[in-house]
Amino acid sequence: MVSSITRIQNYVIDGAATSDGLATVLESNFAPSLISLPATPLFGTDGIRGKVGELLSAPLALQIGFWAGVVLRSHAGQLRPVILGQDSRNSSDMLAMALSAGLTAAGLEVWYLGLCPTPCVAYLTSVSEAIGGVMISASHNPPEDNGIKIFGANGGKLSQALQAEIEKGLRGNLPITSNVSNCGRHYSRRELVKDYGEALKRPWQNKVNLQGMKVVLDLAWGAAVGLAPSVFAEMGAEVISLHNAADGDRINVNCGSTHLEMLQAAVQEHNADLGFAFDGDADRVLAVDPTGRPVNGDYILYLWGLHLKQQNQLPDNLIVSTVMANLGFEKAWQQQGGKLIRTAVGDQYVQAEMIKTGAMLGGEQSGHILCSHYGMTGDGLLTALHLASLVKQSGVSLAELIDQSFQTYPQLLRNVRVVDRDRRLNWQNCTPVQQAIALAEKAMGDTGRILVRASGTEPVIRVMVEAANAELANYWTNELVAQVQQHLAP
């Protein structure tokens, strides 16, 4: 008797697979559930993410690997490898091996990189023969969380349509059975990470070096350990490293891009020119200037965009950012003759808008920066090297560049923990919260902004208020947080 999985494999192997045809095969082969999935969508703004042992498990990773393999093969129409990497979390080995088992059960070859940044997976996927890439990481989340990010053959985040196909297969929960003739193989390809490191330095070869610069790097006990310090040193910088070891118990704990305090102190203590803080998978970065002042993604986009504009290299003087971008950034960029397009929060939305509009530069306030000249995913190391080179070429300090850029509107962001997933994702149905938002928007008019949204990566509702002064921002933030806590997080 031919198993359901074998029938699906044969359908894809035959080379006649189409999206509609695959859906028909999936629907005709559904079986009783083997894993428990939430009623709400599994994919968030940055892949699949959750607490290990609750949402994420080895059986789920196995299923995700298999269905990702089936969908990727159905759209590629041929057998090519999948590139797989991971961060330093204790659970990453388990999830990576389970996911690799699923991919090989789908008949695909796996090239395993081991510990590496997320943009390393994206880059190697885009320049190799790979059919796609997968990264095991929960980015800036705490050690007990983990996640699965899937990339297409171009190195960009997988489209929502393909994510939906994978989730459709997952919700069928077919038992995974395979046979020797259909299995793929798992190969260790750790040497490829060096190719990514060389690619990072390539834009500045024989043009710019960082000699004479002192740089502090906070590696957050994560995926950039070792690699980032070596790349900066090879570019000529004097490097001081913080949290530069792979530590699954401490990744992101009071360090990295969400906790700049130690980096700020170290930059001032060592009289460094600038500092960079990466998150756990190094797809984002925030900077610190010589005075210890934080430099977020808005400033990085402005400085990088202005440099490109002055070189006549920025198409339509366009930058893509999100609804979180500060009004001060937007107004200053407009005064420079530039245009800013806002998207929903999430680099996948920034990526989609960049593709749609032909924009070269985009990103998020949180430090995800995308430049289509180099690829279509956020790259913390590449962004850090660009900012450092801009400072070196300018002949002035990062502090002076920031002083000359723009003044931000006071902006407060508060996170309210809402454990109930359904209540969190459907918060818009809460009338008291909507009424409070309407009242605040009416009171501030066009001198402020309010953004309330469910996080796509954490069990929280984010409340952001931007106002003409700090007192107004603080007042309305407190009012809205109180309503969310009372009605959504009792």
UniProtKB/Swiss-Prot annotation:
Phylogenetic placement of the source organism: Bacteria, Bacillati, Cyanobacteriota, Cyanophyceae, Nostocales
Cofactor: Mg(2+)
Binding residue positions for Mg(2+): 139, 279, 281, 283
Similarity field: Belongs to the phosphohexose mutase family.
Protein name: Phosphoglucosamine mutase
Keywords tagged on the record: Isomerase, Magnesium, Metal-binding, Phosphoprotein
Species annotation: Trichormus variabilis (strain ATCC 29413 / PCC 7937)
Gene3D superfamilies, sorted: Alpha-D-Glucose-1,6-Bisphosphate, subunit A, domain 3 (3.40.120.10), Alpha-D-phosphohexomutase, C-terminal domain (3.30.310.50)
Disulfide feature: none
GO biological process: carbohydrate metabolic process; peptidoglycan biosynthetic process; UDP-N-acetylglucosamine biosynthetic process
Keyword Metal-binding set for record: yes
Coiled coil region boundaries: none
